[in-house]
């Protein structure tokens, strides 16, 4: 499924052709299906095949029938578990509202009713910190212990920026879905815009494609 999704994004010109990961790659993951009770959750513990019961921090309560879990190690060395479940989603009340969305650089999104979602230009201080950390990393000898420590520092700053961006996009996409029955959004060729170096940073930062994806799957949920 992950490979199919990667090729789908590639053919839509949203990313490069998928490449198989080396074992040396700091990002590794695997998915295992639920079979005969091999996956279970009890409080702050999760039972996983071959690992048994281990402690984990839940971001939310897990409801529904477990289908599979994916274990992933991110660039900073942290491990995450994603749990796919089958559950019923309660439909939202009808609002009889239709809305159009324009996205841009000055403001992240402007609705046809005048509602504006500002582009917060996430974490300028973190960006400066990231640039400094990357400069230090470039001066380290690749593969050495000091290089690896600095690589982890860079990865953690990237994580903070990514997490904050995801939180923002989830917040506004959920708000729009809950308040409007029909939603229209312009079709943007982000990959073409990314060829313009002056726009690349801003577009990457506000993540229009990710926002559109969230709207699409949340609309299907409800």
Where are these regions (language model features)?
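Acidic carboxylate diad motif detector
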Residues: 1-74
């Amino acid at each position: 499924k992950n490979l199919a999704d990667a090729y789908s994004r590639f053919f839509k010109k949203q990313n490069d052709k998928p490449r198989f990961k080396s074992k040396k790659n700091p990002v590794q993951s695997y998915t295992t299906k639920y079979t005969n009770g091999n996956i279970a959750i009890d409080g702050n513990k999760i039972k996983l095949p071959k690992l048994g019961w281990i402690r984990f921090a839940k971001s939310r309560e897990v409801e529904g029938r477990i289908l599979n879990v994916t274990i992933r190690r991110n660039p900073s060395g942290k491990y995450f578990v994603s749990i796919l479940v089958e559950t019923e989603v309660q439909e939202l009340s009808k609002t009889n509202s239709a809305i159009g969305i324009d996205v841009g650089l000055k403001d992240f999104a402007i609705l046809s009713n005048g509602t504006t979602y500002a582009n917060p230009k996430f974490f300028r201080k973190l960006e400066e910190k990231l640039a400094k950390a990357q400069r230090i990393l470039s001066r380290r000898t690749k593969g050495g212990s000091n290089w690896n420590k600095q690589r982890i520092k860079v990865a953690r700053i990237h994580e903070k920026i990514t997490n904050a961006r995801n939180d923002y996009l989830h917040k506004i996409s959920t708000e729009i879905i809950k308040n409007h029955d029909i939603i229209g959004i312009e079709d943007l060729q982000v990959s073409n815009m990314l060829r313009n170096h002056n726009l690349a940073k801003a577009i990457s930062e506000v993540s229009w494609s990710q926002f559109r994806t969230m709207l699409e799957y949340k609309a299907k949920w409800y």
